[in-house]
């Protein structure tokens, strides 16, 4: 009886050890955070970035996010023109294949819904970009431009460069 009890105990201990070894090899699946494809940039708007540069005390910022899946730009633009009695007359995304920090480019996408006073804050989203536009944007060939009644060609510009 002692022998069968000893054999039973050895079998039980062996099964427990086997279970521990098997279960210790099973790791809990680690959940990886999804990789965000969204590109982001925070840019400063100034007259010094205009081509040619303009003299203004106006300033602004633009928080730009680009979703390559949807091919859309989401933006938050804040600005203050240099002349408090000036009005904001137009706002655009500019860009082209030959675009750069040192070149003025044509309008790629207009921005609407902005305040027409000398200062404002605007949140918005663009229409879907074409493949060509998306490639230009990602290559740093686009910029934001704010036109005013004081400087019709553009008072504030910010070149879009993603991190």
Residue ranges and their predicted role:
Residues 32-69:
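Transition segment at domain starts
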Residues 80-81, 96-101, 149-152:
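Acidic glycine-/aspartate-rich tracts in secreted/extracellular proteins
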Residues 134-136, 143-157:
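Short, exposed beta-strand-loop hairpins at the edges of beta-sheets
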Residues 2-14:
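Bacterial N-terminal signal peptides that target proteins for export
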Residues 2-4, 20-43:
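Bacterial Sec-dependent N-terminal signal peptides
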Residues 62, 90-94, 144:
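Divalent metal-coordination and catalytic microenvironments
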Residues 100-134:
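An anionic, turn-rich surface loop/hairpin at beta-sheet edges
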Residues 82-87:
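A short beta-turn/strand-edge loop motif at beta-sheet boundaries
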């Amino acid at each position: 009886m002692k022998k069968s009890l000893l054999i039973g105990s050895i079998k039980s201990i062996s099964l427990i050890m086997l279970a521990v070894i098997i279960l210790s090899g099973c790791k809990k699946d680690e959940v990886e955070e999804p990789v965000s494809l969204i590109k982001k940039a925070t840019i400063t708007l100034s007259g010094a970035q205009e081509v040619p540069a303009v003299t203004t005390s106006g300033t602004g910022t633009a928080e730009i996010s680009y979703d390559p899946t949807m091919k859309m730009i989401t933006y938050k633009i804040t600005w203050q023109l240099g002349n408090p009695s000036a009005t904001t007359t137009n706002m655009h995304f500019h860009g082209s294949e030959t675009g750069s920090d040192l070149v003025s480019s044509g309008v790629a996408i207009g921005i609407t819904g902005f305040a027409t006073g000398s200062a404002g804050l605007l949140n918005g989203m663009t229409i879907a970009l074409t493949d060509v536009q998306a490639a230009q944007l990602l290559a740093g060939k686009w910029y934001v431009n704010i036109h005013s009644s004081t400087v019709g060609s553009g008072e504030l510009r910010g070149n879009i460069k993603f991190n």
